Amino acid sequence: MRASEVMIADPIVVAAGATSSEVAALMRTKNISVVPVVDNPKDRRYLGTISDRDIVTRCVGLGHDPGDCAVQDHARTDTPVVKPETELKGYKLPKQLDPGDHHVRATIVVIDGDKRVLGFIPHPEEVPGIIIAP
């Protein structure tokens, strides 16, 4: 099974420069918890990924005002990325944990050769053949 077969095509993205408050409001409105961060909505070049939990732990939890936090400053840059043609059977996805955290952060962003976001796989642990590596 290829990434293009299971990804959410043309996912919601947020542009660098958006505030954590704006992203949190978008997440609430769209009922999503993770979103790719891109350079701008037109080009959609991937910069990182931000989750609702990241906003809490990397912005609010550190005493910052989410209205003043630029989302790219708190985005994760270690989210796995693949091409649409990537075969997922046997794909090893690293378990991403913060120190002292037991919450698995498993997501995959699908990009093209120019790093443009094409898709998003929000729950790869549910995709047959993907291995969550310890």
Predicted regions and their residues:
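Methionine-biased hydrophobic packing positions in alpha-helices, especially
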Residues: M1, M7, M27, A75, ...
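Regulatory sensory and allosteric helical modules in signal-transduction proteins
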Residues: T57-G61, T77-P84
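Short beta-to-alpha loop/turn elements within the nucleotide-binding domains of ABC transporters
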Residues: M1, A18, I50, C69, ...
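Short beta->alpha transition motifs characteristic of CBS
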Residues: I32, P36, R45-G61, H102-D112, ...
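Bateman (tandem CBS) regulatory domains
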Residues: M1-I12, D54, D68-T79
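The conserved cystathionine-beta-synthase
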Residues: V13-I32, V38-D39, V81-R105, V110-D112, ...
